[in-house]
Swiss-Prot record:
Family membership: Belongs to the intermediate filament family.
Molecular-function GO terms, alphabetical: structural molecule activity
Protein name: Keratin, type I cuticular Ha4
Organism this protein belongs to: Mus musculus
Ranges where the record places region Coil 1A: 57-91
One GO cellular component, as annotated: intermediate filament
Stored Pfam families: Filament
Residue intervals of the IF rod domain: 56-367
Chain positions covered by the region annotation Tail: 364-392
Annotated segments matching region Head: 1-56
Region spans: Coil 1B: 103-203
Top-level taxon of origin: Eukaryota
Region (Linker 12): 204-219
Note from the entry: There are two types of hair/microfibrillar keratin, I (acidic) and II (neutral to basic).
Length: 392
């Protein structure tokens, strides 16, 4: 930035310097800072009425120096700002963007595995139910077998007792038959002895003695034996019938008792089986609930671990972003402070430029617009440029 753009009020004076009344020595020297203002303007006689004093020259020199340093500082800050922007862009390009890892595929795999685990658990529970049903059926068949076995043992015991009774009756019958045979043999012996005695007596007495004896009529032993046999057979038949009736009644009562006890036993066994089924069903349900609770606890633990890991990753990401945001804020704050400093410097420089401009405008107002005409009117010369020369 040059002084000509900052100080447009100097155009009148710079145009006047091109006139021939101004000595050549007045055009060579300029102020520091390339303001194109003649430094020896106070040496000309035509400038004697509106010349600057020493303080104004020092002020203009100071303002030119400040303006030059300000422009240099502005250029330096622009260069530093460009360097910082390049460094920020390089750093952003070098840093890899923080991308959250994709867990969707793992989540799908985990969900598929959880579905498979649930299917396997349901299949396991179904197999456990089938095994328990098979155990219940085997228990039912075992109880039925034990019931039939106990009934068979009872029937075999009854048959054995009846066989013992039959053996006793057979022995009794054989004893009675033996007694009948012994009585028959005894009767035959008695008949034979009686006939022998009668024959001996007849032989002793002969025909000499004929004794008539009023005796009881002879008894038919065969008839008596037959009657006795009939009586014993009737007695045996009666005893057999009574024993058979007693056995039948006892068997019926025993069968009734066995049937009633078997019915009671079957009802009790049915109740026991039903209670066992209920208990097994409740145990199966309890086991299923335990398995479900364990699976839910495992799922909850896995979910907590997964979400805690995700939360830690997100927290790390947030921490990194916050740190970067803090750095960016610090950079922005620093740049804002520098900008505020620059704004303050600019405001001060603008204030100084305005002061400088007001001073120049006041000096321009004090200077005549055509100094050559003024000197012609007064009839004076231009001082050191030559006393015999006129200014126009």
């Amino acid at each position: 930035m040059s002084c000509e753009s900052c100080l447009p009020a100097l155009s009148c004076r710079t145009s006047c310097s091109s006139r021939p009344c101004v000595p050549p020595s007045c055009h060579g020297c300029t102020l520091p800072g390339a303001c194109n203002i003649p430094a020896n303007v106070g040496n000309c006689n035509w400038f004697c009425e509106g010349s600057f004093n020493g303080n104004e020259k020092e002020t203009m020199q100071f303002l030119n120096d400040r303006l030059a340093s300000y422009m240099e500082k502005v250029r330096q800050l622009e260069r530093e700002n460009a360097e910082l922007e390049c460094r920020i862009q390089e750093r952003n390009q070098q840093q890899d963007p923080l991308v959250c890892p994709a867990y969707q595929a793992y989540f799908r795999t985990i969900e598929e595995l959880q579905q498979k685990i649930l299917c396997a658990k349901s299949e396991n529970a179904r197999l456990v139910v089938q095994i328990d049903n098979a155990k219940l059926a085997s228990d039912d068949f075992r109880t039925k077998y034990q019931t039939e076995l106990s009934m068979r043992q009872l029937v075999e015991a009854d048959i054995n007792s009846l066989r013992r009774i039959l053996d006793e009756l057979t022995l009794c019958k054989s004893d009675l038959e033996a007694q009948v045979e012994s009585l028959r043999e005894e009767l035959l012996c008695l008949k034979k002895n009686h006939e022998e005695e009668v024959n001996t007596l007849r032989c002793q007495l002969g025909d000499r003695l004929n004794v008539e004896v009023d005796a009881a009529p002879t008894v038919d032993l065969n008839r008596v034996l037959n009657e006795t046999r009939c009586q014993y057979e009737a007695l045996v038949e009666t005893n057999r019938r009574e024993v058979e009736e007693w056995f039948t009644t006892q068997s019926e009562e025993l069968n009734k008792q066995v049937v009633s006890s078997s019915e009671q036993l079957q009802s009790c066994q049915a109740e026991i089986i039903e209670l066992r089924r209920t208990v097994n069903a409740l145990e199966i349900e309890l086991q299923a609930q335990h398995c479900m609770r364990n699976s839910l606890e495992n799922t909850l633990t896995e979910s907590e671990a997964r979400y805690s890991s995700q939360l830690s990753q997100v927290q790390c990401l947030i921490t990194n972003v916050e740190s970067q945001l803090g750095e960016i804020r610090a950079d922005l704050e620093r740049q804002n402070q520098e900008y505020q400093v620059l704004l303050d410097v600019r405001a001060r420089l603008e204030c100084e430029i305005n002061t400088y401009r007001s001073l120049l405008e006041s000096e321009d107002c004090n200077l005549p617009c055509n100094p050559c005409a003024t000197t012609n009117a007064s009839g004076s010369c231009c001082g050191p440029c030559g006393s015999s020369k006129r200014c126009c």
